[in-house]
Amino acid sequence: MGGERVALSPGMATYRRTRRRVRSRRSTPRGYTRIVTTPLDPNLPARHLTSTKVVAVRGVQLEVRDDIVVGEEPLEIRAAGPRQQPVNVAVTMRTPGFEQELAVGFLTSEGLIAGNEVTGFEAGDPGFMAEPDDAIVVRLAKKLNPGIAKPRNFVATASCGICGKASIDDVAVRCEPLPKGLPVVSRAVILSLASTLRAAQAAFDRTGGLHASGLFEIDGRLVVIREDVGRHNALDKVIGSRVMAHELPLWDRILMVSGRVSFEIVQKAAVAGIPIICAVSAPSDLAVRLADRLGVTLVGFLRGDGFNIYTHDGRIDLRELMGVG
């Protein structure tokens, strides 16, 4: 049915009015047909998103209809040096797509390899009833780091990337503090990041069920965005894409994430050399402490025309608000 296009609020989807106007942030409003304008990456597998039947209850009305849900499958990450048998490193629950980036980003951000060690990839045997790309072998130029070869109990869930590590020592990747005097970014650029990231979230538009990580130039231009059911996976895919492009360290980039900031997000960003992390939601206390120690600028609650700077505020140019310059 035709009708006017109604923008519900900045950063939200546009809907076509069919009956009466209702606002909603979490699902298609009753009386509207969702219009998705951001195209999906053509490199994504069909399993990235799937269709399922739902019984939708809206007030006193119900409807049986198709709904789009995000894919979630295990990925077994293995690694092997020259003339070595692959070693199982981790199993992570992820949204299918960009498996090579995820594997390389994971190994790099966990401090297990350096980016220039990767020589190629092989498909692993995922076992019974798994998809062919549910296991990947990362081939390395030199023999395995002892940190990879030691026994591990490493199962990363979508919500907890560090769950199941063998010891507390495994949680803290040793990372040197970032150099001081890294880029200073304008307030206007910081304020633009959330809406730019949201506008590029093609899969979220269809499901409402994905986290996103975006890497930006210091002038606010989006370099790469990745979406995944796990926030740490989305970041690993971003980091992996830059490792494979031989761009690390990322000292002149900004990271924007769609949710909260945990210890692990700060750790992974710092390993990649990212000096500024921005988030729509709050950081944890451990994330703040780690960012402070590693010299990372941490920005939270980036919404509308405001944000909070938790650490190393010198990288955000606030002179106009202070009547200076």
Residue spans of the language-model regions?
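Hydrophobic alpha-helical segments
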Residues: 119, 175-178, 183, 244, ...
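Intrinsically disordered, low-complexity regions enriched in acidic/Ser/Thr/Pro/Gln residues
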Residues: 35-213, 217-225
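Intrinsically disordered, low-complexity regions
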Residues: 3-4, 12, 32, 60, ...
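A mid-sequence, solvent-exposed acidic-amphipathic segment
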Residues: 194-258, 264-265
